[in-house]
């Protein structure tokens, strides 16, 4: 068991106050503190103190003895810690994104390598051959968009802006997946006068429309007034997660985080196809090829946890990670898994034991538990989040 020393990513959309208010993390230079990373991602691995008292990279520690630390099955299947665990603090909307599935990621990665596109090139889509499933768990009220609305709902929301673009009128005449695909691509392709006119019609509709999703469009327009992604809340479900609610983000499904603080767990991948609310490169043909144009009702988007005593287990449809919450009390309980785990203290305090070793976690602190250290004993007050594997 080792306490993690984690890095903060200072992306421009991050909150300058959330990590300080929630977890007392100092921010003397008033930087945006967008994401706290827990894991062994090559871009920014957590660090731990070794037996000699030196601070070393968790990635290097794992690399030196994968089977023991990750567990035999995970080491064989993934060859590394297969997940990245984050605290995400959004003060501004993030870009609308789509993550390709595993098969397309492998093909796209090989194709871009063969074409000699540098890894850091703006037009590079595939940074690795992996998929990027994600789970988001709200710590504060959390606003997001996820998946296409039911087509009948899109039709009624598009009525006030029917004249903004011919592709909108086409979809209204025949609301099916093919027309939605054309509409999605057409809105992203808009340039110059065509784009100005469409956005003017949308903004004029804002004057007469109340409630959602118009309120979300107003919020986004404060940050991206000239982005065609402003139409996206009319097409995608706007989801408000209450603290303690979670949502899984499937491959090939457009989504965006807009505002709030959440825990996020994902597979170790940087594969992102952008779809608006960004000044960055958008590869529209590649994006459209990787989107499933199917509706998903908003009431099916939340992940329903399964309660097992003091544990809440959130079912995850992939092997890359598992996620559960543990409510602590003075009564000792054990936490066990056949893999490595990262434990994060969400609130309160936790004491962990393994043999003669004892570790205390305060809110915002986290620990790495190697596979060969399972089970560990825990007690305290408040709540622990656990990310691990069920292989």
Curated annotation (Swiss-Prot):
Coiled coil: none annotated. Gene3D superfamilies: Jelly Rolls, Phosphomannose Isomerase, domain 2. The active site is at 274. Belongs to the mannose-6-phosphate isomerase type 1 family. The modification N6-acetyllysine is found at residue 280. Involved in the conversion of glucose to GDP-L-fucose, which can be converted to L-fucose, a capsular polysaccharide. Pfam families: MPI_cupin_dom, PMI_typeI_cat, PMI_typeI_hel. PROSITE patterns: PMI_I_1, PMI_I_2. It is found in: Cytoplasm. GO terms for cellular component: cytosol. Zn(2+) binds at residues 97, 99, 134, 255. It comes from Escherichia coli (strain K12). Its EC number is 5.3.1.8. Binds 1 zinc ion per subunit. InterPro entries: Man6P_Isoase-1, Mannose-6-P_Isomerase, MPI_cupin_dom, Pmannose_isomerase-type1_CS, PMI_typeI_cat, PMI_typeI_hel, RmlC-like_jellyroll, RmlC_Cupin_sf. Disulfide bonds: none annotated. GO terms for molecular function: mannose-6-phosphate isomerase activity; zinc ion binding. This is Mannose-6-phosphate isomerase. SUPFAM superfamilies: RmlC-like cupins (SSF51182). One of its GO terms (biological process) is GDP-mannose biosynthetic process. Its main location: cytoplasm. Keywords: Acetylation, Cytoplasm, Isomerase, Metal-binding, Zinc. It catalyses: D-mannose 6-phosphate = D-fructose 6-phosphate. Its cofactor is Zn(2+).
């Amino acid at each position: 068991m080792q306490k993690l020393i984690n890095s903060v990513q200072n992306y421009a959309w991050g909150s300058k106050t959330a990590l300080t208010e929630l977890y007392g993390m100092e921010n003397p230079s008033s930087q945006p503190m967008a994401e706290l990373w827990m894991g062994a991602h090559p871009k920014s691995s957590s660090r731990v103190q070794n037996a000699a008292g030196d601070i070393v990279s968790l990635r290097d520690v794992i690399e030196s003895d994968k089977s023991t630390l990750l567990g035999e099955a995970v080491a064989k299947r993934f060859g590394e810690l297969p997940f990245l665990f984050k605290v995400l603090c959004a003060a501004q909307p993030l870009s609308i994104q789509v993550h390709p599935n595993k098969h397309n990621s492998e093909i796209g990665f090989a194709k871009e390598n063969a074409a000699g596109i540098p890894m850091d090139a703006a037009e590079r889509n595939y940074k690795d051959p992996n998929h990027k499933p994600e789970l988001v768990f709200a710590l504060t009220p959390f606003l997001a968009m996820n998946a296409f609305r039911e087509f009948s709902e899109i039709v009624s929301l598009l009525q006030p802006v029917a004249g903004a673009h011919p592709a909108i009128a086409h979809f209204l005449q025949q609301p099916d997946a093919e027309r939605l695909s054309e509409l999605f691509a057409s809105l992203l392709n808009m340039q110059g006068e065509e784009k100005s006119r469409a956005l003017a019609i949308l903004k004029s509709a804002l004057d007469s429309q109340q409630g959602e999703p118009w309120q979300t469009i107003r919020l986004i327009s404060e940050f991206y007034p000239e982005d065609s992604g402003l139409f996206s809340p009319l097409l995608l479900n706007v989801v408000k997660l209450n603290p303690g609610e979670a949502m899984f983000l499937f491959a090939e499904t457009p989504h965006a985080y807009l505002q709030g603080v959440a825990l996020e767990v994902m597979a170790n991948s940087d594969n992102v196809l952008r779809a608006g609310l960004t000044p960055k490169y958008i590869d529209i043909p590649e994006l459209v090829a990787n989107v499933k144009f199917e509706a998903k009702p908003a009431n099916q988007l939340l992940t329903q946890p399964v309660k097992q005593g003091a544990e809440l287990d959130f079912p995850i449809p992939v092997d890359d990670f598992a996620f559960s919450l543990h409510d602590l009390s003075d009564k000792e309980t054990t936490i066990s898994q056949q893999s490595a785990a990262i434990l994060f203290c969400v609130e309160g305090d936790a004491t962990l034991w393994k043999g003669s070793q004892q570790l205390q976690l305060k809110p915002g602190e986290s620990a790495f538990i190697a596979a060969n250290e399972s089970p560990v004993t825990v007690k305290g007050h408040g709540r622990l989040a656990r990310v691990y594997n069920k292989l």
